[in-house]
Amino acid sequence: MKLNEIRDNQGARKSRVRVGRGIGSGLGKTGGRGQKGQKSRSGVSINGFEGGQMPLHMRLPKRGFNNIFAKDYAEVNLGAIQKLVDAKKLDTAGVIDHAALKAAGVARGGKDGVRILGKGELTAKVSFKVAGVSAGAKAAIEKAGGSVEVIEVVPAAEKAAAKKGTAKAAKKA
């Protein structure tokens, strides 16, 4: 058998049926949709509509809320950091911050900065400047001879507002 001789098994792929193309095809006129009515018409059905019965999403109770003050951290584990150090993708000589972790491809998203978590082992002596750190991670970093500085990350909107305010103050003076 050669690559050009490979075929699908019999009946593995069904050919597309062209409905509504004459009575000789067996699927002409109504195209397998029955007679008149809402279900015979074209267009997408209404999502979640159950024929007038109360839909499931309305039968179930409301639950929870969206906390507008919730912090969005990019969470990075110590094991992932150690792997990057071993692969020489992270420089341990300087301070490791959000930008360095993002460049290394380990911190994705996180508009409020990076939070380091304690999963995995860290043997390298590393100093961090991050938005958050768990107690276990802090202990492991200090045990390895490193240090952690927790900084407050100012959101972009607040930075822009502060910058705009200083520009206005400079204009007045």
From Swiss-Prot:
Gene3D superfamilies: 3.100.10.10. Residues 1-50 are annotated as: Disordered. Residues 1-11 have a biased composition (Basic and acidic residues). PROSITE patterns: RIBOSOMAL_L15. Signal peptide: none annotated. The keyword Ribonucleoprotein applies. The keyword Ribosomal protein applies. It comes from the Bacteria. Residues 21-35 have a biased composition (Gly residues). InterPro entries: Ribosomal_uL15, Ribosomal_uL15/eL18, Ribosomal_uL15/eL18_sf, Ribosomal_uL15_bac-type, Ribosomal_uL15_CS. GO terms for cellular component: cytosolic large ribosomal subunit. One of its GO terms (biological process) is translation. Keywords: Ribonucleoprotein, Ribosomal protein, RNA-binding, rRNA-binding. GO terms for molecular function: rRNA binding; structural constituent of ribosome. Binds to the 23S rRNA. Part of the 50S ribosomal subunit. Belongs to the universal ribosomal protein uL15 family. This is Large ribosomal subunit protein uL15. It comes from Rhizorhabdus wittichii (strain DSM 6014 / CCUG 31198 / JCM 15750 / NBRC 105917 / EY 4224 / RW1). The lineage of its organism: Bacteria, Pseudomonadati, Pseudomonadota, Alphaproteobacteria, Sphingomonadales.
